[in-house]
Regions:
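Unchanged
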Residues: 40-63, 74-131
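A short, polar/proline- and glycine-enriched secondary-structure boundary/capping micro-motif
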Residues: 31-35, 116-117
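Conserved N-terminal beta-strand and adjoining loop/helix that marks the start
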Residues: 1-20, 89-94
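A beta-strand edge to alpha-helix "cap/lid" segment located at domain peripheries
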Residues: 1-4, 112, 131-136
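Short, solvent-exposed loop/turn segments at secondary-structure junctions
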Residues: 3, 29-30, 73-77
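Charged phosphate-binding loop/patch that engages nucleotide di/tri-phosphates or the phosphate backbone
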Residues: 129-147
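N-terminal first-folded block
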Residues: 12, 18-21, 25-33
Length: 147
């Protein structure tokens, strides 16, 4: 089995019991809801990645944020007929302030590299099967429980 590492920065954009999630396309989380964010590029800090990815995926300019968690999960998936195990490592930030109206920016359902767009979801209405492993872990760390 091929073993890979993925290092990323992700945003927790909350409004009461609602959280912004993206609908993933491709990869081990295909069809799942995931936190907006992505890969830390060569030379980038985790914070620079956070700002870039949230502008790309959600359409917001991050103004104020705080580190919430650093965590990892292992995900195994079938990639082109070969099993791959990915050690998914992330920095997770609570977004406290941003520019642009998130609702108008995420209403566009355009397909980019790895998502079908983003929107607010009521956390209490989500099922754990809908979520990526890493999103589930972080939402539970916020104090929410799933059956």
């Amino acid at each position: 089995m091929k073993e890979l590492k993925h290092l990323g920065s992700y945003g927790l954009i909350l409004d009461n019991d609602n959280i912004v999630l993206i609908s993933k396309v491709g990869g081990p989380y295909d069809g799942k809801l995931d936190l907006p964010g992505g890969t830390i590029e060569f030379g980038e800090t985790p914070e620079e990645t956070l700002k870039r990815e949230l502008e790309e995926e959600v359409g917001i300019k991050v103004i104020d944020y705080e580190l919430f968690d650093g965590n990892s999960v292992n995900v195994t998936w079938n990639h082109k007929g070969q099993l791959e195990s990915i050690h998914h490592i992330g920095f997770f930030y609570k977004i406290n302030k941003y520019e642009n109206n998130i609702k108008s920016n995420i209403a566009i359902d355009s397909i980019n590299d790895d998502s079908r767009g983003a929107k607010f979801y009521n956390i209490k209405e989500l099922k754990k099967e809908q979520l990526s492993n890493i999103a589930l872990l972080e939402i539970e760390k916020l104090g929410y429980k799933f059956d």
